[in-house]
Amino acid sequence: MSSPDTKLLLLEELEDLKRMASHLAKSLDRCAGIDVSSGRADLADERVEAFTSRFARTADLLVNKALRTLDLHELESPGSLLDVLQRAEKRGIINSARELRLIKNLRNAIAHDYAGDNIAETFELCRQWTPTLLSATQRLDDYASNLPE
């Protein structure tokens, strides 16, 4: 794939990521009043399901799509998830590869419904890590805007 093609693909994936990040931010705001200590009734709220699903989708788009396409565009050899995250850290897109691995593990728990039994903890972790995802999305957007063809 040529560089202009990979840049176009990256920009398309980045638009999807930014759209999902916007939905995630709105869901975070809508969940602000939910108190997980009050019992499972609040956790059965559709807002919680929408929020955790959007968190998982945003993490997936960032890690599995956009960051991997950025590597492809910059002619990096495909590698493991750790390789992708370490390169993103070196570029200044993420603060820490370790943090993004935790986010990716949380995403996997949500996607494979391992989170059902621990919904309160999952919900709180999603709230905790959402600013990190939103920040990484913005930094990737900034980084991509300075890429050569």
Task: List where the protein language model places each region.
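Solvent-exposed interaction patches of small proteins and small membrane subunits
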Residues: 1-149
